[in-house]
Amino acid sequence: TPLYSSAASDVYKRQVYNWGEYIDPETLTMFEEETGIKVVYDEFETNEIMYPKVEAGSSAYDVVCPSDYMVQKMIENDLIQELDYDKIPNAKENIGAQYYEQAAAYDPGNKYCVPYCWGTVGIIYNKTMVDTPPTKWADLWDEKYADNILMMDSIKDSFMVALKKNGFSSNSLDESELQIATNDLIAQKPLVQAYVVDQVRDKMIGGEAAIGVMFSGDAIYVIGENPDLDYVIPEEGTNVWIDGWVI
């Protein structure tokens, strides 16, 4: 990837586009102090926000952290370049082989992506507001939680929830199954307090909602901040995701 230098200060820069709360700001400061490279750091909430910005080329990002399915799309559309592992030996030394094996499902040969984080999508709930721990995705349609439900502002994840609720594959392309999921999401809308991504953390910590959809990494954080919260994976199953670094 090219080096970007300031004519005034001759300081090298790297432009990074990443999920919110994915790198401690102190880590960025340490990197800048150790390398002399300035990090220009932007955050996104969903892959669907990130992709068109990268595709348009309006911002010259050097490094981006998309999810598995989006890595595959970026490879297919020639938006990212192959990695030279000779220049990043720590990528193989410090990351377990099992993660590369999982990533090979969407990046054959691990040519384009270094795995960074993985997790699940599940239900976060407040034990003081939910009498019985949720066990099914359908619990997000329970009318007793009206105006206390938080859904993800993400087409992919919301459809995953609705598809799994009905016993379908989260990757279904069947039109009839997708229509059933669509109808369910429309029917659920009057019960939903808000469609959120990063805001779900503060809302659940503050006791502003009873139940919602959350990534497992966020769940670990919010449970640490509010012991009244708990996280479950519904019995119908869920999506396991991997986010990784690409150039």
Which stretches of residues belong to each language-model region?
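A ligand-binding cleft/hinge motif common to bilobed small-molecule-binding domains
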Residues: 70-73, 211-228
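Extracytoplasmic ligand-binding site segments that recognize negatively charged/polar headgroups
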Residues: 15, 60, 65-208
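Structural motif
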Residues: 44-56, 190-196
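Single conserved hydrophobic/aromatic residue that forms the stacking wall/gate
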Residues: 1-8, 12
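Envelope-exposed proteins and targeting segments
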Residues: 35, 119-121, 243
